[in-house]
Amino acid sequence: MICKNCGTEFEGNYCNQCGQKATVGRLTWKSVGDNLLHGIFHVDNTFVKTTRMLIVHPDRLLSDYFEGRRKGYMAPIPLLAVWCVILLFFGHIKGLPGSISTLETSAMHNWIVEHYTLLTIATVPFMVLAVKIAFRKAGSARYNWVEYLLGCCYLSVLYILLSLVLIPVGWVLDASYYQAYQWGSMVLSLIPTYWAAYSLFPDKFWITLRRTLWAVVLYLLFFTVIGGALIYPFVD
């Protein structure tokens, strides 16, 4: 077979000289869309596949990634970064007048929003430490720090997906329900947390739930004390 890109003769699915695919079809709307996504975000069908697997089978995704079966999956940090950008885009949309989305926010909140991607990635170690402590009796030592860091990056994507579901509610819900909206969001965030915890450390429901709640408390403590102390000097 002759490569259409460099003219090298080769066998297989890819040219061993320039990496061009063996089968290059005509340009279509689908191919243009795929190239556009890949060019702007460096995202292709692995983005959709990884996100879907993260929602439906997080245990299989983490198992595959940790055991080296990574072909076809998008790496956790780029996946998290892309979803952060998507969340920021929708988070800046204002809804109906008087809705939660139109409320004035504090300087601390504004700073967090402006640096959301960096902050999300930077707080992953707090999540890792909380999980290692809360699930130590469930065998948390079986995974190393790097595996936990990348696994928690995937978990952070689940939180972002939940936020994307809740944002439209803030566009229409009256601002007087802000506290209820916040508490509801916190309670719902336990669902992906428990789902991920059970995927890594399967056990009885109440045992996993208790450890999950303990991990959440530890994470909030670490984030408030350590994260708050580091962030405060940068807030105007």
Predicted stretch roles:
Residues M1-D236:
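Membrane-proximal intrinsically disordered regions of secretory-pathway and membrane-system proteins
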